[in-house]
Amino acid sequence: MGRSLKKGPYVHPSLIKKIREMNEKGEKKVIKTWSRASMILPEMVGHTIAVHNGMKHIPVYITEQMIGHRLGEFSPTRRFGGHPDKKAVKGKIEKQG
């Protein structure tokens, strides 16, 4: 269930403050944030935001198609190690039995 429309989108106050200051100055620096729950607003388009994934900050360039999504959607938190090799698994079973 999503957030009520009458409440408006959630954006961390310090993040929106930094975005607005940079828009006034016309700067395009990378902004580090831990706020994965913040929603992407139209005024963020064109900025690069480094979103924390639990281990490091992943740079995310904001485009128009991302408006309305959350920052955390673009910074995966889980690492996929790959599926096990069938030959290696078969060899382990033969050695045990």
Curated annotation (Swiss-Prot):
Record region (Disordered): 74-97
Basic and acidic residues bias (residue ranges): 82-97
GO biological process: ribosomal small subunit assembly; translation
Aminoacyl-tRNA synthetase recorded as keyword: no
PROSITE patterns referenced in this protein's UniProt entry, alphabetically: RIBOSOMAL_S19
Name of the protein this chain belongs to: Small ribosomal subunit protein uS19
Function: Protein S19 forms a complex with S13 that binds strongly to the 16S ribosomal RNA.
Keyword set, alphabetical order: Ribonucleoprotein, Ribosomal protein, RNA-binding, rRNA-binding
Keyword Ribonucleoprotein: yes
Name of the gene this protein is made from: rpsS
